[in-house]
Structure formats: structure tokens, C-alpha cells
């Protein structure tokens, strides 16, 4: 992921990855624009939207197979502040799709942060105050466009954590992972 680099350095890095990966039969997802939030214990406080003027040059010069764009999503379970109205920049998505017709577009940081999982976690000893994600209707709108993949890692982590916390509260003496992970 070279999205934190300058445009030129992102192209250079992504092209190197593409050349190596394609030689080994592996596809590559490039990324333009930077998402805020926490990913892999790295905290990025500021985001930058994908500039549609850059996408054709980036895809052409790198040879990437799909492109992750930044339209207002962010990593982690705390994407928005309470009372904040989540807004995704569908105008950017539409313009990118117009400039790259039939090219696979990806959204990173698009977990909906399912309230039921947050509730289970909090009811079973967790503390996820004000965890807010992307509204499902916005994800459905994105999926109906050129978006072919929506990354929802935080939702998977929340579901797993909710299940584990609930299991341990109901079965406090359990210590055999085969019984609670199997």
C-alpha cells in the first residue's frame, strides 16, 4: 500500500509490486487516496480523497488489476463521531468509474460496525463506546456501482470478539480453545 506516499512514489512502488506479483501469477490492488483511522496499529489522523484526475495515469503506469479509492471511508470501528452524519463521496466514485469503465474498484475501511456485535461486546465486559461505521445502505449503493470488493475487516473482528466474549461469560471455566473456537 503506497497510498501514504507521493503520487509518483506510489506509482513506482505499486509498479514494482505489480511486476513481481504478475510474474508469479498474483493480482495486485493499487490504492489512491489515504484513509484515516487505525490499521495494523498505525493511526492515520488525516485522510485525502482520491483525485479522479489521477486514476487513469496511475492504473496505466502501474498495471494494477484493481484500484482501492478513498471516498470517505476509514479504518477501524470508530469511523465517525456521535451525531456526525456519515457521508461518502459518491461523486468521486462515479467520476472514477466514468474514467475507468469496467475497471474493478475497491473500498477499504468500509465496515458497517454492526450495532448488535458492539452491544454484545459491551454487555460482556468490553468497552466500545461510540463505535460507528458506514451505513449499510451506503455500502449497497457502492456495491451497485463499479465497486467489486468492500473490505469489512473491523466487522469480522467485532463478530469474532462478540462471540468469544459471550462464550467466556456464559462458560467462565472453559479453557479449551477447541471447544470455543471449533
Where are these regions (language model features)?
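Short catalytic/ligand-gating loop segments at beta-alpha or beta-beta junctions
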Residues: 107-112
Amino acid at each position: 500500500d503506497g497510498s501514504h506516499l507521493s503520487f509518483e512514489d506510489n506509482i513506482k512502488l505499486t509498479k514494482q509490486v505489480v511486476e513481481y506479483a504478475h510474474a508469479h501469477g498474483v493480482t495486485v490492488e493499487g490504492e489512491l487516496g489515504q484513509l484515516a483511522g487505525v490499521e495494523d496499529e498505525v493511526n492515520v489522523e488525516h485522510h485525502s480523497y482520491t483525485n479522479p484526475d489521477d486514476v487513469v495515469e496511475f492504473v496505466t503506469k502501474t498495471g494494477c488489476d484493481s484500484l482501492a479509492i478513498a471516498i470517505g471511508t476509514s479504518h477501524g470501528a470508530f469511523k465517525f463521531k456521535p451525531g456526525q452524519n456519515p457521508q461518502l463521496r459518491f461523486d468521486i466514485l462515479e467520476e472514477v468509474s466514468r474514467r475507468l469503465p469496467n475497471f474493478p474498484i475497491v473500498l477499504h475501511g468500509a465496515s458497517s460496525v454492526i450495532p448488535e456485535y458492539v452491544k454484545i461486546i459491551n454487555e460482556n465486559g468490553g468497552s466500545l463506546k461510540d463505535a460507528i461505521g458506514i451505513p449499510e445502505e451506503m455500502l449497497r449503493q457502492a456495491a451497485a456501482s463499479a465497486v467489486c470488493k468492500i473490505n469489512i475487516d473491523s466487522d469480522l473482528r467485532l463478530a469474532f470478539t462478540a462471540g468469544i466474549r459471550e462464550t467466556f461469560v456464559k462458560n467462565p471455566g472453559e479453557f479449551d480453545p477447541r471447544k470455543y473456537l471449533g
